[in-house]
Design a protein with these regions (language model features):
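Bacterial Sec-dependent N-terminal signal peptides
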Residues: 1-26
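Beta-rich carbohydrate-recognition and catalytic domains
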Residues: 25-252, 263-309, 321, 327-349
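Phosphate/diphosphate-binding loops
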Residues: 316
Length: 349
């Protein structure tokens, strides 16, 4: 087997439990003003210098900079609670990191946005994705093509949503399917589960695997769910089948949230997050004729419960050299981003 490279970074944050929400047709738009930016880099940079929201984020960072418990090497939110990293990708010379950002003026998950040349030094950008018609913008992944970047994520209460952007700094996003894959409503009996998606492309067909859990294990215990869908146009999606075959590594009670699927070395990797034991991965073989993944090896990034302080919620992208770069979430109770490390210090004695 050829050498496999997995680069991992930690993402300092805190956790809020996933709630169950009633089905609603639509939710109000964000209280944060959504702006449109120019389509060329020179004008975008000039507009960002004067942007009031970017200035606000800079002021938040300035407030925290002298806090001894503020993470320096690891990315953390400019304000408020920080949830999962999402949609890590490389586009036109920059690394882009999206994350579940809960602004103080509208305490719902938006996709925050930061850009970097080296995956270490990050610069805040305006919010990328705003909730509505979905209640909140949960986890998902991106796919960078030659002419655009595709984001696919779980929109709370409606299903998986597809959005695209093609400008130099990925500032302007258009939702092309809301939802692309509708959520399974209460009382519906369907062979699949709709939650966090990962997206890729084979030939001219897009594929998405939605990870999560179903109560189909022994004694109605939760079991991981990996449902495969396909589309030719990003708008109309067809359910194919259960993506993972002959998987014997995960016990009842595990789930497969925040999935990512990609070739690595001469095999394939399936990254995911269990709400029981944190970030994990499966290596195996992918049958392109069947469009099924056959895992043969299981590994963990986290060796304890993911609460508190565990490594979880991976966001990944190809490094362009046959490897995969992964950024994980790391949380500690419901603390502001600048006080996360203080929690570990106080509980390390």
């Amino acid at each position: 087997m050829s050498k496999i490279n997995i680069y991992t970074f930690l993402f300092c944050t805190i956790f809020l439990a996933i709630g169950c929400y009633a089905q609603q047709a639509s939710y109000p738009k964000s209280k944060i003003l959504q702006k449109n930016f120019s389509s060329n880099l020179k004008d975008q940079l000039r507009e960002l210098e004067k942007d009031s929201f970017v200035q606000y984020l800079n002021e938040c960072r300035e407030k925290w900079k002298n806090n001894p418990y503020r993470p320096i090497y690891h990315f953390s939110s400019p304000e408020s609670i920080l949830h999962d990293p999402n949609g890590l990708c490389y586009w036109q010379g920059n690394w882009h990191l999206f994350y579940q950002y809960l602004p103080s003026k509208d305490f719902r998950q938006h996709w925050g946005h930061a850009v970097s040349h080296d995956l270490i030094h990050w610069k805040d950008l305006p919010i990328a994705l705003y909730p509505s018609p979905e209640n909140m913008c949960y986890s998902g992944a991106t796919l960078a093509e030659k002419d655009k970047v595709i984001a696919m994520y779980y929109g709370v209460d409606i299903g998986d949503i597809v959005a695209t952007s093609s400008d130099p700094l990925l500032l302007n996003w258009e939702k092309v399917a809301t939802p692309a894959i509708p959520r399974v409503k209460s009382g519906e009996t369907l062979p699949y589960y709709v939650f966090d998606p990962a997206i890729w492309k084979e030939d001219s067909i897009y594929y998405a695997v939605t990870g999560g859990r179903t109560n189909t294990g022994p004694g109605n215990k939760a079991m991981r769910s990996t449902s495969l869908f396909s589309s030719k146009d990003l708008k109309n999606w067809k359910y194919e089948h259960n993506f993972m075959k002959n998987e014997c590594f995960l016990p009842p009670g595990e789930d497969a949230s925040c999935p990512y699927f990609w070739p690595i070395g001469n095999r394939y990797i399936f990254l995911f997050f269990s709400h029981t034991t944190g970030s994990q991965y499966l290596l195996g073989d992918y049958n392109k004729e069947e469009h099924c993944f056959y895992p043969t090896f299981h590994g963990r990034f986290n060796f304890m419960s993911f609460l508190p302080g565990g490594v979880h919620a991976p966001s990944a992208t190809s490094d362009g050299k046959g490897g995969v770069i992964v950024i994980h979430n790391m949380q500690a109770k419901n603390l502001p981003a600048g006080e996360v490390l203080q929690h570990f210090r106080e509980n390390s004695h």
